[in-house]
């Protein structure tokens, strides 16, 4: 075989050790020390299955069964299953409760995986309206309008889907309003919580939802791929239907889902998650401070104000103007950040960028503010 295997030896990553990472897709997935320790015990393939009697969610050692029960309590739901991610959770719901050709009514800020999931399940969709620039907030009443339009045209609706917090602008949707609309119309509501569960408090019962799709690696301090599907008991028979061939295995889970390091890291991080969501107001204070300071530089924060989530998206005409004159062009900002030990911002981007300071200390946040201020002021003239 003509294969150079040297590139697979000694693979390393120093981003988290050497650089303050501002990437919003990664800030919520950083493991605490206690979760890192468990990796050494469960890094072998099927190590989680030492005492398995046939189904992942029933394993007692390690206590996966108890963890899933506790997670249901944490989320204000009835039943929870591990998945490989929020996208798999969404697909499981769609594939179980919808019929081929049904319509999913979903918000205009939905993640691409929501579309991929419904397409894979052979479903159609109608997208609801969002506010115009610069807020881009989901408009709850648009759900009622789209539902009415579909019903009037004789289309079958299988599911209502709402993105709790979108990854583009970090807007927090008004779940209660959409939940009331879904209930009044008689349709189940799936809440995509990939950017919320694990970062901020989420209670499914209070929010009036039927399903929660969560991401372990995106927002719950877990290794990937890992997610959760939490459901209300009334949908247990549909979602958790078992195989005719192997009556123990649940169809939508394809028998067993996330096992090994992903599920164990999620379990080990659970105490950390419970505590950190209690400090959500402190996270918002840091986020709003960043927005306040950077808008003084000429940055334009997109999305709702005041910010209600740690994801921040800035339009940065001042950086784009600097890039026009700098010989490094669009790469100048990335390189200047790197010099100062800051990463997570896409290379070559100066028109706009996204960032998050979730989980960083106050001193780290101040350092980031001071660094970006200095980059702008030193290069603006």
From Swiss-Prot:
Oligomeric state and interaction partners are given as: Homodimer. Interacts with SepRS.
EC code(s) of this entry: 2.5.1.73
Q: What does this protein do?
A: Converts O-phospho-L-seryl-tRNA(Cys) (Sep-tRNA(Cys)) to L-cysteinyl-tRNA(Cys) (Cys-tRNA(Cys)).
Q: Name one GO biological process term.
A: translation
Question: Which residue spans adopt a coiled-coil conformation according to this UniProt entry?
Answer: none
This chain's source organism reads Methanococcus vannielii (strain ATCC 35089 / DSM 1224 / JCM 13029 / OCM 148 / SB)
Q: What is this protein called in UniProt?
A: O-phospho-L-seryl-tRNA:Cys-tRNA synthase
Protein family per UniProt: Belongs to the SepCysS family.
Quote the record's binding site residues for pyridoxal 5'-phosphate.
86-87, 192, 215-217
Matching InterPro entries: PyrdxlP-dep_Trfase, PyrdxlP-dep_Trfase_major, PyrdxlP-dep_Trfase_small, Sep_Cys-tRNA_synth_arc, SepSecS/SepCysS
Q: What does the record give as cofactor?
A: pyridoxal 5'-phosphate
Supply one GO molecular-function term. Answer: Sep-tRNA:Cys-tRNA synthase activity
List the catalysed reactions: O-phospho-L-seryl-tRNA(Cys) + hydrogen sulfide + H(+) = L-cysteinyl-tRNA(Cys) + phosphate
Residue list for modification N6-(pyridoxal phosphate)lysine: 218
Name the keywords, alphabetized: Protein biosynthesis, Pyridoxal phosphate, Transferase
């Amino acid at each position: 075989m003509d294969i150079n295997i040297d590139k697979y030896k000694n693979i390393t990553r120093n981003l988290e050790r050497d650089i303050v990472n501002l990437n919003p897709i990664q800030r919520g997935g950083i493991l605490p020390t206690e979760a890192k320790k468990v990796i050494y015990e469960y890094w072998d393939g099927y190590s989680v299955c030492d005492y398995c009697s046939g189904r992942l969610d029933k394993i007692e050692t390690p206590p996966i069964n108890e963890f899933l029960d506790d997670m249901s309590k944490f989320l204000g739901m009835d039943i929870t299953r591990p998945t490989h991610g929020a996208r798999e959770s969404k697909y499981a719901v769609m594939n179980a409760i919808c019929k081929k050709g049904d319509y999913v009514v979903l918000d205009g800020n939905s993640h691409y995986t929501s579309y991929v999931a419904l397409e894979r399940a052979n479903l159609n969709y109608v997208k609801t309206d969002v506010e115009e620039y610069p807020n881009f907030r989901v408009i709850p009443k648009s759900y009622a309008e789209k539902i009415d339009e579909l019903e009037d045209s004789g289309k079958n609706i299988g599911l209502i889907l709402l993105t709790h917090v979108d990854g583009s602008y970090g807007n927090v949707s008004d779940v209660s309003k959409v939940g009331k609309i879904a209930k009044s119309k008689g349709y189940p509501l799936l809440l995509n919580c990939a950017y919320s569960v694990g970062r901020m408090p989420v209670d499914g019962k209070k929010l009036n939802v039927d399903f929660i799709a969560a991401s372990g690696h995106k927002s719950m301090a877990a290794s990937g791929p890992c997610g959760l599907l939490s459901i209300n008991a009334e949908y247990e028979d549909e979602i958790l239907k078992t195989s005719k061939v192997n009556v123990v295995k649940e169809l939508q889970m394809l028998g067993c889902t996330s096992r090994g390091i992903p599920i164990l890291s999620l379990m080990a991080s659970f105490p950390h998650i419970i505590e950190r969501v209690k400090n959500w107001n402190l996270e918002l204070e840091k986020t709003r401070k960043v927005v306040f300071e950077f808008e003084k530089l000429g940055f334009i924060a997109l999305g709702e104000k005041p910010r209600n989530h740690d994801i921040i998206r800035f339009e940065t005409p001042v950086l784009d103007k600097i890039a026009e004159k700098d010989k490094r062009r669009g790469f100048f900002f990335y390189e200047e950040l790197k010099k100062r030990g800051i990463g997570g911002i896409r290379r070559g981007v100066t028109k706009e960028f996204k960032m998050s300071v979730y989980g960083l200390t106050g001193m780290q946040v101040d350092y980031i503010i001071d660094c970006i201020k200095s980059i702008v002021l030193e290069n603006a003239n």
